[in-house]
Amino acid sequence: MPFKSLTLAEIRSYEQETVEFETGENLIFGPNGAGKSTILQGLFGGLFQTNITKKEVNNDFNLPELVRKQAESGRIELAFVVGGEEFTVEWEIKKQFDDDGEVTGAQTKSGYPKLSSPALDESISGFNDVQDEIQRIIGMDAKSFVNSVYVQQGD
């Protein structure tokens, strides 16, 4: 399952960045703090809406921390190919504020995450429906994906 591209808008250290992936192997490297882990979070979070940087795969994203401090909302868009068909999953996150302007939390915007493809009769939206469809398309769940393709730092 090759990744085609990843767009991060107002996510962690990225104001607006699109990473285009080449066919075959791609190397992500850079100094500490350059955003390598954010790219991995974008890839994995885009597919499964879960956090890959923890030892256990779970839904423990700290959504307010994903969105840049200066921004009110952020967006992840991931394009990937399965069986010759391209799929795009979009995930938008909006911070929530109290009356004093302090961040109190965050949630996915209405209608997100969203999965679209010419291979689908119509776009699919909503956390559970998108997650179920992606698992069906790629033939594995988040835990199986991590165990197949990802090595944690320090492992």
Name these PLM-found stretches.
Residues 1-132, 136-147:
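Extreme N-terminal "head/tail" segments of very large remodeling/mechanoenzyme assemblies
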Residues 147-155:
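Short, intrinsically disordered, charge-balanced linker/junction segments flanking boundaries
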